[in-house]
Amino acid sequence: MKINDPDGENIIYINERLRNKIDKIPLYDITVIDAPAGYGKTEAASFFSKEHKDEVRTISVLSPSTEIFFYDLCDALGQYDSGASVLLKSIGFPKNDGHIAKIREIIKNIRLQDELYIVIDNYHLVSCDEFNTLISSLAGNMNNKIHFIMVMSYIDSQIVRNAVESGNILYIGKEYFVFTQDDICEYYRLNGSDINEEESNAIYGLTKGYVTSIELSLLQQKVDIKDKIIKNILWDRLSDKTKERLMLLFIIDSVSIKEIMDFKISLMTEKELLLFMNTSYFIEYDTGKCRYCIRDIFKDFLKEVITDTEKESKRGILEKAGAVFIKRDDFFAAYKCFYEIDEWEKIYGSKPEFHKIYPVLKAENKDFFMKIIKEC
């Protein structure tokens, strides 16, 4: 997490738990840094790079193209062994066990005088069985001063999970990035704002230690412009389709990948869904419930966005939300969505079994049901 230094120097704040893990990187051939968007994993890699300067080469993966990524990797290694780079390029990105074996031997045979750390940022974009097998086979078997640091938003490979569990790979997960109440106090102090324990606990309760949310809370304390910052820095940069997905997730409260696939909520593949859910600043994953939801700090903003959106512009979103609630047997929530966009046929065509609608036939819901009856 960056600090607003009065001298203009780019300072990165790293909590003690994370610093202790980063200090172990030189002891491993392979390091996996795994955390969703907004936790500061790229900043952590930058912190390590700053401390090791000439020993680090960073590859920023910007697309799912494995060929472009592999050529960038070859070029990075070519700065130290041009012959190895030529051999690797002649093989190309590994497509089978034979390729993996050849590439593995070429990398293992590179000899360096000094340590070399290859940081691969956004590795999740090119993660695949072949390269994961290669990386896993190199873990603990290099002995040539080359280290790979894989920075990713999520792990979708059992191969990588198995390698992490074997102990041959240094794993730095989300739990090391989450701020404690003490971390929050220290971060505020370094940014010129002292807070007490009660205030720190309140911020932690709202943000759950999520780095980006804490940054927004700090900005809100300095000037009451949190929603404007969310809009200008985060929201306005999103595509219309992404905005619709986030509004839908806010309305339906939470969702699992399985539910999305079973209910056909999205046309995205499971891999595309994992990428979207784990690289959005707005979304968090509840490990206890195994469900994705909107982060608390963004809920008021999204509620206002939905309220301000014209009926016709959010018709598709509310229709999808209503359909999800119907499949969940939450008819009352579904009717609220359909009512807002005058979808009377969907309300009266739902025909719920009595035992499913009975729980919501309560006095506090009387006015809403009377509206449905009068306005149909």
Task: Pin down the residues of each PLM region.
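C-terminal leucine-rich, beta-strand-based interaction scaffolds used for sensing/assembly
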Residues: 252, 256-332, 343-344, 355-356
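Conserved NTP-binding/hydrolysis module of P-loop NTPases
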Residues: 67-90
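Conserved P-loop NTPase "ATPase switch" module shared by AAA+ and STAND
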Residues: 106-131
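P-loop NTPase Walker A phosphate-binding motif
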Residues: 31-59
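A short hydrophobic beta-strand->loop->alpha-helix junction that borders the nucleotide-binding pocket
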Residues: 35, 57-66, 92-93
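Alpha-helical sensor/transducer elements of the RecA-like P-loop NTPase core
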Residues: 43-45, 133-202, 212, 216, ...
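Amphipathic alpha-helical "lid/sensor" segments that cap RecA-like P-loop NTPase cores
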Residues: 38, 169-171, 181, 186-244, ...
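N-terminal pre-P-loop "Q-motif" helix
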Residues: 8-22
